[in-house]
Amino acid sequence: MPDSRHLAAFFVAALLLAITPGPGIFYVLARSLAGGRREGTLSSLGTFCGGLFHVLAAALGLSAVLATSAIAFSVVKYAGAAYLIFLGIQMIRTRNTEPAALAGPDQRLAAIRRHPVLQGIWTEVLNPKTALFFLSFIPQFVVHARGHLFAQFVFLGATSVVLNTLADLAVVQFAGPLGRLFQKNAKFRSRQRAATGLGMIGLGLYVAASDSHS
């Protein structure tokens, strides 16, 4: 484990990055507004799992492929952007669909297939910039003299993911009640889901158009 000085510096830097608005926070915010606190919390759990995937990938050296291969980076980036756009389109198409608890068996099955945890996982896994972030940020706080580099990397990476998730959950707490209010009114729900869908599409287009290694 890194020494206390490195840990303190890492914690401050990771906390500042966690509370800085970015695609992850905006994604969780959109899901919270669309489905209330429960959907936002489950989406946060999904992005948490996706973040841990990137931590392990970076620790094992797999993420280095994205850093060295422009083709691999572009493929993952555009796949992630396409997935966000797909979610946005689906949200617009189903803006007038009943909540799963009131829907029939077929609609419940469809809702399960669109589970926010799985969507959160894929949204984070298909974000190559998360991989590059861990490759560039975490190594600055790894102390080679202390050895156990893999364990240090995983510990620091997991800590960063936890801080990001706590920031996401804070967003859920504020946005969730507003989302539940929308869910109680069919007209508001329809309009809000349409607006959220457009926001997801916009986020996907932003990811696709952004500079690859910024």
PLM features per residue range, with description:
Residues 2-74, 136-156, 160-161, 172-179:
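Juxtamembrane transmembrane-helix termini in multi-pass membrane transport proteins
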Residues 5-6, 206-214:
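Juxtamembrane boundary at the C-terminal end of a transmembrane helix
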Residues 15, 19, 52-53, 79, ...:
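Hydrophobic/aromatic residues within the transmembrane alpha-helices of Major Facilitator Superfamily
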Residues 38-116, 174, 205:
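Membrane helix-loop-helix hairpins that form the core translocation module of multi-pass transporters
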Residues 56, 76-83, 129, 133, ...:
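Residue-level signal for the membrane-embedded core of alpha-helical transmembrane segments
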Residues 74, 87-130, 177-198, 210-214:
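Alpha-helical multi-pass membrane helix bundles of inner-membrane/thylakoid proteins
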Residues 87-91, 161-169:
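Transmembrane alpha-helical segments that form the membrane-embedded catalytic/substrate-channel core
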